[in-house]
Every structure is written in structure tokens, then in C-alpha cells.
Design a protein with these regions (language model features):
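Substrate-binding cleft and catalytic face of glycoside hydrolase catalytic domains
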Residues: 48-221, 252, 272
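Secretory targeting and sorting signals
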Residues: 1-10
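Structural recognition of the beta-strand scaffold that forms the well-ordered cores
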Residues: 25-30, 51-61, 102-107, 155-159, ...
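Boundary/entry segment of secreted carbohydrate-active catalytic domains
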Residues: 13-58
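Glycine-centered loop-to-beta-strand initiation motif
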Residues: 441-455, 464
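Surface-exposed loop/edge segments in extracytoplasmic proteins
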Residues: 433-440
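Noncatalytic carbohydrate-binding groove/subsite architecture in carbohydrate-active enzymes
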Residues: 37-39, 106, 134, 138-148, ...
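Aromatic-rich peripheral "rim/lid" segments of glycoside hydrolase catalytic domains that contact
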Residues: 70-71, 75, 158, 163, ...
Length: 493
């Protein structure tokens, strides 16, 4: 049993997690462009300090043969079967590895012959067959085993995109009862057996959940924490304070005997506000709710409901804010630059060890996503311009004030070096028009540096720079924005 307390007033607070001591690696997502542009883009991802490239969607339905039935003679576990169409993915994987990146392949969308009968949802979403998915993943893992033709090794495999949404997996409920979590668990287990069967060091990433759902799940989707609890067979119960009658703690217990085979649980914690924003409804999960998700995962691990030969990790495999400009409803770029550094700090504090930014470059303004690290150029990739947030993503640094008494304020310093490697980092404060040294910190082997200092008088801005002078962070103000942005992901409201 795991008990998690809330605030004394009964309101939920950010769940307390032991101060993280591990790494916080980064990645960037990729939306397909002509192959000629891949090399430039992937080099930019690496230059952004990222080690991972998320390739999504890897549409099973686009690689496998189409139609209502499997073709005669089709060998679904054979990566060389002529019915498969791998060439586009081959090109992306080869270019990513050549750029020094680790590809994460997010597999989704079933071919028609691998769906359940009587489809009521969108194409590729309806009761995807766990056994047929396993055969496809066997072929894919063999193809990218590092020993097939001239193709490189792929180790990281995400199973489905946002399976708690009707858009990607249906039905969410059957007869008014939750259905998708149990079906998804079967898919995860089949996928894990297939991928680990090819190579035991393959990493199976589960979850990939969207941040928002509704209680009547079939109208839209299942709340991500509720979905997670059902997949991992954990029940949650609120315990009410006897005086206030409000929930003062949560108790997590095993809810069934089913086991889930997964190496990483991942989430997409988009927000309607800044880095500490919590979803309005309990069960949904934005950035400020990651501690709650971590508590569910910890409870499942403690109950031995999760089966893995590896240390089970918690990742954010998709996140971003649209920026203004170019999106008139996006986050003002100066505010977003601050928030990117703080987002990486807050996710690290919640036990997240990998964060991937949704896309590298903006889409045109007549499309949905202007959340890239680069502004879209007028004449193609070569004319793209980096946004100020790129430096914050590459070299995150925060200085968070904490008032101890009327006369004393502590400043919590945290950052990560651009290459996620050890070294000396100089912390500076702005005094008048000049920057003055505060102290020198040692970054650990993962590039993390941190310290607590007493706030110097008349100081608002801090920054970090590498001791060799080769790079420096964006300056971070002790004064948070007075009127922080509130809106919808991708400027949709």
C-alpha cells in the first residue's frame, strides 16, 4: 500500500518526490520531410543537446500490406517479406543514427486486417490484434537489430500513440465499462514478448498517454491517470480529513493479479498554463501532475505488477508550447524561454529521466503546430531560424527563490550542461550592467549541477556559463511573470 498526502486544506498539491539524482536527457520529435532534408534536421537535433529522436508515427498500416485480409503467403515476422514497405523508415533510421541520435519508434495504427470485426472507431484504432502486432514488431526488431543488411540498431520502441484517446484506440468503453486499458495491457505484453524475444536489451515504452480525458470516456477518451491505474492494476482511494471532510491523502493498492510487461512508462503532459500547471480535474495530468503519475508507477512497481528485467523509468516523450510569434494564441517567446528551462527542472524533480520536445521546426501557420525549436524558413529547412527557446532547451538553468524568513531568501540553483557531461560551471549574477561571479559548481557525469545559496542583495538575474567560456545559459529572473499565459496546447482555444 502506498499513501500520498495532499495539502492541509485538502487541495491536491504537487506530489512530493525524493530529490532526483539521476540524469535528465532530451530528445526531439520528427515530422517527416523529404529525405534530402533529414540530414540537416537531425544534425540540428544533436546540436540542441538531444540524444534521442522520436519518429512518429511509425504507422503499421503504412508499412504492412493493406486490405481486409492478409495476402496469401505473407510472412509477417519476416523483415524481408516483399509485402512490407520499409524504405521510408529505413532512410529516417539511418540518418538519425548517422547523426549520433538514438531513434525511438512510436508504433501505431493497425492495418485493417489486424483490427477487430465490426469497427466503430477510426481506421487503424479498433481493437488492434495483440498477436498480429507482436508478429509485426518481431519483423521490425529483426530488421533494426544491427545485423540485417546495412541497417543500424534500434533499441527503443513506443507502443501506440495516446491509447487513452478514441482518436487512436477504440472503443474506450464497452457497455459503459472501461475497456481500452485491459486491451492495451494485452498489446503491451504481446509487444514486450516479441521485442525482448529478438533482443532482451530492447526497451518497451508504454503509456504514451494524452494529458486530458473525460469521465464518460467513450465520448473522447479516458483520463490518463485512470487509464494508467487500470493498465497497471492499481486502485486509488482518497482518504478524507476528519475535520475538513476533504481528501487529505491517497491510498494506492493492487486492484488485480494481471501483470504488465513494460520497461518505461511515458506521458505527454501538455498544459493550459506554465510549468507548475495542474489539470483542473483529478485523473488528468499536466506538467504539475507528473508526481501523481510517478506515485502510481511506484505503487505498481512495489506491488510487482510491472514486469521488467530493467530499472523501470518514467519519461515524457512528447511536450511543447506553441510560441508567439508565430501563433497569435501561443506563449510569448520570452515567457516560453523561461518556461522551457523550468519545465526541464520540474520534470527532473518528478523523477522523469527523458523529455522529448514535440517537433524541431514550426509548421506553416495555416497548420496546427508552431511549437518547434526553429521558426519555419521561407525557402525551406536551410532558411529556418532558431528560436530563443533553443538555448534554454540545450542549456537549461533556473534560479528559484524560496523565502525562509523576513530577512532571508534562499535561491535554488539547478541546471544541466549542454552536452550532459561533467565539468565546471560558473554561476553569475547581474549587478548593474555587469555580471559577477557567485560561485563555481561541478556538474556530475550526467551534466547536472545544483546548489542552494543565500540571495545576494539587489540581485534579480542569474545565469550559468561553462568555465571554459564556450557556452552560457539564458539569464533567469527571480521574478516570475506577473500575468502568466493561459490557453490550450497548440493555440487551439
Amino acid at each position: 500500500m502506498v499513501v500520498v498526502a495532499t495539502s492541509a486544506s485538502g487541495a491536491r498539491k504537487v506530489a512530493t518526490i525524493k530529490t532526483a539524482s539521476g540524469p535528465i536527457e532530451t530528445g526531439v520529435g520528427f515530422l517527416s520531410l523529404p529525405p534530402a532534408d533529414n540530414v540537416t534536421q537531425f544534425k540540428r537535433v544533436r546540436a540542441a543537446g538531444a540524444n534521442y529522436l522520436v519518429i512518429r508515427p511509425v504507422a503499421w498500416s503504412s508499412i504492412a500490406p493493406s486490405g481486409a485480409t492478409e495476402p496469401t503467403g505473407f510472412q509477417p515476422t519476416d523483415p524481408a517479406d516483399p509485402n512490407y514497405k520499409w524504405s521510408g523508415l529505413d532512410t529516417q533510421v539511418k540518418a538519425a543514427v548517422a547523426a549520433g541520435l538514438k531513434p525511438i519508434l512510436i508504433v501505431t495504427k493497425a492495418p485493417q486486417w489486424a483490427e477487430g470485426s465490426g469497427r466503430s472507431g477510426g481506421p487503424g484504432t479498433y481493437k488492434p490484434s495483440p498477436s498480429k502486432l507482436a508478429k509485426f514488431l518481431t519483423a521490425a526488431a529483426r530488421r533494426y537489430s544491427g545485423t540485417f543488411m546495412d541497417l543500424p540498431r534500434v533499441r527503443y520502441w513506443g507502443i501506440w500513440s495516446e491509447p487513452n484517446l478514441n482518436t487512436f484506440m477504440s472503443p474506450q468503453t464497452v457497455g459503459g465499462k472501461s475497456f481500452s486499458p485491459g486491451w492495451y495491457r494485452s498489446m503491451l505484453n504481446a509487444a514486450a514478448d516479441a521485442l525482448h524475444g529478438v533482443n532482451s536489451s530492447n526497451v518497451v515504452i508504454g503509456g504514451e498517454t494524452a494529458p486530458f480525458g473525460v469521465k464518460s470516456a467513450d465520448r473522447f477518451g479516458t483520463m490518463p491517470i485512470a487509464f494508467m491505474e487500470k493498465v497497471l492494476c492499481i486502485s486509488e482511494k482518497g482518504v478524507r480529513n476528519k475535520k475538513t471532510k476533504k481528501i487529505s491523502s491517497y491510498v494506492y493498492k493492487p486492484a488485480c493479479k494481471a501483470k504488465t510487461k513494460v520497461d518505461v512508462w511515458s506521458h505527454h503532459p501538455y498544459t493550459q498554463g506554465g510549468p507548475t500547471f495542474r489539470a483542473k480535474l483529478h485523473g488528468n495530468a499536466s506538467l504539475g501532475d507528473l508526481g501523481d503519475m510517478r506515485n502510481v508507477l511506484n505503487a505498481a512497481i512495489k506491488a510487482k505488477n510491472v514486469v521488467s528485467s530493467k530499472k523501470i523509468r518514467f519519461w515524457v516523450t512528447e511536450f511543447s508550447w506553441d510560441s508567439k510569434p508565430p501563433d497569435p494564441k501561443g506563449v510569448p517567446i520570452a515567457m516560453e524561454t523561461r518556461w522551457v528551462s523550468e519545465m526541464l527542472y520540474r520534470t527532473w524533480s518528478s523523477g522523469v529521466s527523458l523529455v522529448t520536445w514535440f517537433i524541431l521546426r514550426d509548421q506553416p501557420t495555416n497548420l496546427q503546430w508552431q511549437s518547434g525549436l526553429y521558426y519555419l524558413g521561407s525557402t525551406g529547412v536551410s532558411s529556418d531560424k532558431p528560436k530563443p527557446i533553443l538555448r534554454a532547451f540545450r542549456f537549461p538553468f533556473v534560479a528559484i527563490p524560496q523565502v525562509v524568513s523576513k530577512k532571508k531568501t534562499i535561491v535554488q540553483l539547478w541546471g544541466r550542461t549542454p552536452t550532459s557531461s561533467a565539468g565546471s560551471v560558473v554561476i553569475e549574477r547581474k549587478s548593474g550592467s555587469k555580471w559577477k561571479k557567485v560561485k563555481t559548481l561541478s556538474a556530475n557525469g550526467s551534466g547536472i549541477f545544483k546548489a542552494s545559496i543565500t540571495k545576494p542583495a539587489n540581485t534579480v538575474l542569474f545565469r550559468a556559463r561553462l568555465a571554459d567560456g564556450s557556452d552560457q545559459s539564458v539569464a533567469f529572473s527571480l521574478k516570475a511573470p506577473k500575468h502568466p499565459w493561459k490557453g490550450c496546447p497548440f493555440g487551439t482555444c
